[in-house]
């Protein structure tokens, strides 16, 4: 049996998803789907010793990163409007942009895993919880060239509509 699994992917620019998997400054944005997309689900556990490798360094995701190409760069792990989600023991690396971006997630556990992105990769934050409740970030090793953890309260469109910040967070 294989003890370690490595998932690699390079999303095609022709694959456009109609869901909003990400946002920027509180505005929902269209983006390409990342390797792991958790949307409107509950009771999800992703655990093990495997690696989610976005392999972004071998594509053109970091060339002109502020230019939209059909849709914006994906997050490695996108979570939207979900509840009771746990990531445990995995490694996530070489993200296209922000590595883990939960939006409106309740009861989120990010436990004992690794995030590895090159120090010169543009805007590849580690973890960016946005408007989440009851979040625990414990034992996570983050090696990136940008923000390790950036707590966000949706502003602009979502902030004006929902007035929701991050609450009850343990780091």
Language model features with spans:
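Right-handed parallel beta-helix
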Residues: 42-51, 83-94, 106-117, 125, ...
């Amino acid at each position: 049996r294989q003890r370690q699994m490595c998932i690699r992917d390079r999303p095609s620019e022709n694959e456009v998803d109609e869901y909003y998997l990400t946002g920027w400054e509180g505005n929902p944005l269209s983006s390409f789907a990342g390797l792991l997309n958790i949307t409107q689900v509950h009771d999800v556990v992703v655990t093990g010793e495997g690696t989610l490798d976005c392999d972004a360094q071998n594509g053109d995701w970091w060339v002109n990163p502020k230019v939209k190409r059909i849709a914006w760069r994906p997050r490695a792990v996108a979570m939207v409007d979900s509840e009771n989600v746990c990531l445990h023991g995995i490694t996530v690396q070489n993200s296209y942009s922000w590595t883990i971006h939960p939006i409106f997630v309740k009861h989120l556990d990010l436990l004992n895993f690794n995030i590895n992105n090159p120090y010169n990769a543009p805007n590849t934050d580690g973890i960016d919880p946005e408007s989440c409740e009851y979040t625990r970030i414990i034992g996570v090793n983050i090696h990136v060239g940008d923000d390790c953890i950036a707590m966000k309260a949706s502003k602009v469109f979502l902030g004006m509509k929902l007035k929701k910040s991050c609450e009850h967070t343990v780091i």
